[in-house]
Amino acid sequence: MIKRDGCSQAAVEAALWDSPYEPLATNLKGVIDMQQTYGLERMGLINPQVVYRNMSPAWLTEQALLNQEGVLSDTGALVVRTGKYTGRAPDDKFIVDTPSIHDYIAWNNINRPISKEKFNALKSKMLAYFQNRPIYLFDGFAGADEQCRKKFRVVNELASECLFIRNLLIRPTAEELAQYGEPDFTILVAPGFQCNPQVDGTHSQAAILVDYESRTVLIAGTRYAGEIKKSVFSVMNYFLPNEGVLPMHCSANMDPVTKETAIFFGLSGTGKTTLSADPNRKLIGDDEHGWSSRGIFNFEGGCYAKCINLNPEKEPYIYNAIKAGTLVENVVLDEDTRHPNYF
């Protein structure tokens, strides 16, 4: 997943949410079971048009193109515009305040409370919104250390956002997927759902609500995929300290000979990814890690790097990764060649 901040945004066409195309009903292994719901009804999500679970990058890219969610670059990457939100929306994020978690949150103008009643009401609306729509489902893991990894289920309205989280999280093997069971945490992602601040208690038409008690995240009204990523980190940041693990916003790499690890701390855009992508060292991860008694491990299985001023000589790993199967946000393409303009 690649993104660029600060570019001008085109309006999202209405066709994005009401595509005239029918979902693809087959994959390379044969016909998809159009009746399988993978237990979504247990969380109240009923009557989906169809549920596509853990589809391949090629399939998700094809579906995103059919849905008019984006276009291809000259290297085959899927390029999308995220509309109004080209970054995270901190004013739109809330944590459900309940007695069981109240004393564990540093409440302030960033960690702001919302009631359980408001959360449940908005969740019911979003579940109704998903009815009679195709759902792009991803079941995966956060945490390379199997002793403290968490199972995340991400329910997506858009194929492109399913491609994002499929690339970012740790993907289960076929055997792990068959035995996946119930997730530890579920994230509902509906960019086309618009909140009503006066009724829903939100700051705007967008909202990111985290309920640690019911282990559910609601993301509405924003197509910026970084909200999914940071929601996963928020969950890991809340639960892992009680398991003796220090969550860290950092990149990390390792000397291939001595096995010594270097950690690079910094805010977004300060160079963590660039510093960790050293061709002479082994990359552990570029953004989110845990530090346990067993060592340092990556939460993720992919990379979400800024590509403004991206240079193939200075950052060859990132530059060469922008190809078929990857997702690029908010990068301008040459109209004739489809070559990205990173500058």
Language-model segments: what does each one mean?
Residues 183-185, 189-239:
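Charged, amphipathic alpha-helical linker segments immediately N-terminal to NTP-binding catalytic cores
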